[in-house]
Swiss-Prot record:
Record InterPro entries: AAA+_ATPase, DNA_recomb/repair_RecA, DNA_recomb/repair_RecA_CS, P-loop_NTPase, RecA-like_C, RecA-like_N, RecA_ATP-bd, RecA_C_sf
Gene from which this protein is expressed: recA
Ligand binding (ATP): G75, P76, E77, S78, S79, G80, K81, T82
Compartments it resides in: Cytoplasm
Protein name, UniProt field: Protein RecA
Organism listed in the record: Cupriavidus metallidurans (strain ATCC 43123 / DSM 2839 / NBRC 102507 / CH34) (Ralstonia metallidurans)
Keywords: ATP-binding, Cytoplasm, DNA damage, DNA recombination, DNA repair, DNA-binding, Nucleotide-binding, SOS response
Any single GO CC term annotated in Swiss-Prot or TrEMBL for this entry: cytosol
Amino acid sequence: MDDKKAGAGVSAEKQKALAAALSQIEKQFGKGSIMRLGDGEIEQDIQVVSTGSLGLDIALGVGGLPRGRVVEIYGPESSGKTTLTLQVVAEMQKLGGTCAFIDAEHALDVQYAGKLGVDVGNLLISQPDTGEQALEITDALVRSGSIDLIVIDSVAALVPKAEIEGEMGDSLPGLQARLMSQALRKLTGTIKRTNCLVIFINQIRMKIGVMFGSPETTTGGNALKFYASVRLDIRRIGSIKKGDEVVGNETKVKVVKNKVSPPFREAFFDILYGQGISRQGEIIDLGVDAKIVEKAGAWYSYNGEKIGQGKDNAREYLRENPDIADEIENKVRLALGVAPLNTVAGAPAEVEG
């Protein structure tokens, strides 16, 4: 009996010591730096912007990408990185936010951005000559306190001035990594204070001679991996066909790192060419999973009313009836404990002196 009491005493002491350690870690490194994976605990009162994908908003645990944070989106070529970020831009603009696009790759398709719902007339765009210029412009925009979202496309295209002015065969190891490390040290605090969301798009490279583990790595050194609150790995996993014609990609996004909610969740959605993420398709799939949309054979119904035979027809019905689509989406969000639509508008930013 005494042994049991002693064991309980030790256990209580351990719990007390653990609570003190967790409190110290949170005080030193910030809220959300450590959490129980099974709890599903998330940082409270966090302002977010939707990604344009219901499944990804749910996988992120807070209903979207967190404001006042650095986010990295990376993946192979043509996997949907720019499409996803342009959808985030469109969502931020719907909330009345001001967005900037730092086009270091000099490859932004304005017409395509318009098709995804981006208000291109009010989108700030910069096509810098060097990596230093791109990051100085980013710093100036963040410090202004008037920008809600900045996209840098891409880290690989942030070429240091010394490399541009040098000869083609010059060896300049670690130059870009040092540039990124310095910029992020400077930017992070300001980003938090001004409540600006900064998204870095990144490319994948292969490490030579890797025998075990993944040979893939992202460009620009390790600094971004540390400073990013959210890291998303986006991949194309299949094609969507209409007859013999390929009309889109099946896409998977894995939340590789998440400081505001438990990580490692995945989201699957369709990206349709010329339209972007198929929001209606996701609403149908997640609505069926949450038993909000009924599926009997090939027919889909909502509130006892048939909305289409086959997914394509149901998708078309929701496209023609956006109010019903919003209603179903909000019910799905509510069922899964995620913030409903149009409740994620940010507070006014703080202007840097």
